[in-house]
Amino acid sequence: MPPIYLASASPRRSALLQQIAIPHQVCVPDVDESRLAGESPAEYVVRLARAKAQRVWQHLPPDQRRPVLAADTTVSLGNDIFGKPQHRSEAVAMLQRLSGVTHQVFTGVAVYHAGGLEHALSVSEVTMRQLSLAECEAYWHSGEPQDKAGGYAVQGLAAAFIREIKGSYSGVMGLPLYETSQLLTALGWSLGQAADDSDKLVVKGEFCV
């Protein structure tokens, strides 16, 4: 199976693709991630996923074009979007707002291929237990929240904060595997049939466009 392109710098998304044995090469797109006025969380992540996939596809030489997979994830409480915290106080404020309540995690996933651009949307509900200020501060100092939407990683230390998830665990991580597999199999890709050697699932030579 030839590798697809993964339009993401996220090691979590790469690891999730490896989990379902999809060989891929990482290509990091330069896309403005600002939210448009009046844009819902669902519209936001779908637009960004599509934009990332399209940007990579358009920069590939015609003889190197293979399907491009992209995704975008955001955490939402009501209509407020929580991106990646830039500093300690922002991360702590995010966690305090998420403490003891149920929020939504939206992940848009898109595939650009020779036949066009397809996308899917995963929406999950995550309920956190009550968090103390000291826990929020300590979690920031663990180094884990810095590059995570909503300021937490469900697969990391923050797993101890999560009381319940309704939806897609992999979607909360950043790449919903069910929706991803549906998009790829629709293109004729056979999941799980890649090389036995897992080291061959990630093609060396990450690049940016």
Predicted features along the sequence, with ranges:
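N-terminal beta1-alpha1 ligand-phosphate binding loop
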Residues: 2-22
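Anionic-ligand binding patches
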Residues: 2-5, 41-209
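Cofactor-binding loop segments of dinucleotide-utilizing enzymes, especially the Rossmann-like FAD-
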Residues: 9, 29, 114
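Short loop/helix-cap segments at secondary-structure boundaries that form the rim of catalytic
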Residues: 15-19, 36, 62
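Residue-level marker of intrinsically disordered, low-complexity segments enriched
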Residues: 18, 24-29, 200-201, 207
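Short glycine-rich, Thr/Ser-proximal phosphate-binding strand/loop in the N-terminal lobe
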Residues: 21-38, 117-123
